[in-house]
Amino acid sequence: DVILIGFSQGAMMSMQCLLINHEKLGAIIGYSGALREENIDAANDKILNGKHKFSDTPILLVHGEQDEVVPFQSLAKSKNLLNSIGFNVQTLSRQNLAHGIDPEGISKGMDFLKSLK
C-alpha cells in the first residue's frame, strides 16, 4: 500500500491525492496542512450518498497551535470536511509548536503507522 506523508503544502497535496485518486491509498499523515471545500468538490465523482469511496483510509493530521503560516484552525476545518464525507480522522495538536514538526508529532506518526494492518 502507498502511504502519503506530507508537511504544509505536501500535506495538502496528500489529502487532495486521497480525494481524487482512482486507487485506494494505504494511509495519510499530514503535518501542518489544510483542506478546503473546493478540494471536496473536486472529488464529487468519488462521493456516493455522502460518503467517499475510500473513506476507510486511515488519516492522521498533526498541527501546531502557534502556526502562523497555515492557521491552527485549519486542523479542525480539515477534519470536519473529511468527516463530512465519511472519513475517520485522528488528530494531534501541539500547544507550543509553530509551522513545523516536533518529536511528539514524529512519534505519533510512527505509532499511527505501526497501528496499520
Where are these regions (language model features)?
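Short beta-strand/loop motif that positions the catalytic acidic residue
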Residues: 60-63, 67
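Alpha/beta-hydrolase fold nucleophile elbow
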Residues: 1-6
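Short glycine-enriched nucleophile-adjacent loop
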Residues: 11-22, 28
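Short, proline-enriched alpha-helix->beta-strand connector loops that line the catalytic pocket
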Residues: 54-59, 85-88
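C-terminal catalytic histidine-bearing segment of alpha/beta-hydrolase fold enzymes
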Residues: 76-117
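Short, conserved loop/helix-junction motifs that constitute active-site signature segments
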Residues: 46-56
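Active-site nucleophile loop of the alpha/beta-hydrolase fold
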Residues: 28-37
